Regions:
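Short, surface-exposed loop/strand segments
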Residues: 2-8
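Detector for repetitive beta-architecture
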Residues: 3, 15-17, 26, 40, ...
Length: 183
């Protein structure tokens, strides 16, 4: 119930459902960007998120404030972001208290962040997540098996890549990739 601040959290090692208790339930995401190798939520087993708001509060970095940046890393465990998830963050550059608020990139990663995973990935998204980059594979990490990415009834997602993203090291998928879009 209410608001819970999420800086860095590793989910329990059992299948977990994170469900808001009422309309005021919010996850207050601190600034964590995959490009910095940082995450807000890292899975240690299957996770379903439902009936909660992703609220990306700002962090003041000298002259800019960054809104809308969170990173969820599934590490190959099943991740479901259900239709009851809503978002609250700016989607355009805004000025608050005379400072520019830059929109930032959010990430949902099926594989690992700067790590290879030995299994496959399974990510399902049933809601709009503007400004979000969705990777079925890893970011700077390979996936040794199959990738499954299902996106349904999601009015808007910034960028979808069924495989991975390689910047510092390989991000290969050594299996089949299944990408389902249903709108």
């Amino acid at each position: 119930l209410g608001q819970v601040s999420v800086d860095t959290w590793t989910s329990p090692t059992v299948e977990t459902t994170l469900r808001g208790g009422d309309e005021n339930a919010e996850l207050l995401f601190e600034y964590c960007s995959a490009s910095d190798g940082a995450y807000n939520i890292s899975l240690a087993d299957a996770l379903t998120i439902d009936e909660i708001k992703f609220n990306c509060n700002y962090t003041d970095y000298f002259f800019s404030r960054y809104y809308g940046t969170y990173t969820i890393v599934a590490n190959g465990y099943p991740l479901v972001i259900a239709s009851g998830v809503q978002y609250s963050y700016y989607t355009a550059d805004t000025i608050v208290d005379g400072k520019t608020c830059s929109t930032s990139s959010c990430y949902v990663i099926g594989g690992g962040l700067d790590e290879d995973i030995t299994g496959g990935t399974h990510v399902e998204i049933y809601t709009s997540l503007p400004l979000t980059y969705v990777y079925g594979g890893g970011v700077n990490g390979s996936v040794e098996s199959n990738v499954y990415l299902h996106i349904e009834n999601c009015g808007k997602i910034q960028h979808v890549r069924a495989g991975g993203y390689a910047n510092k090291k390989d991000a290969k998928v050594n299996g089949n990739i299944t990408l389902d879009f249903i709108n």
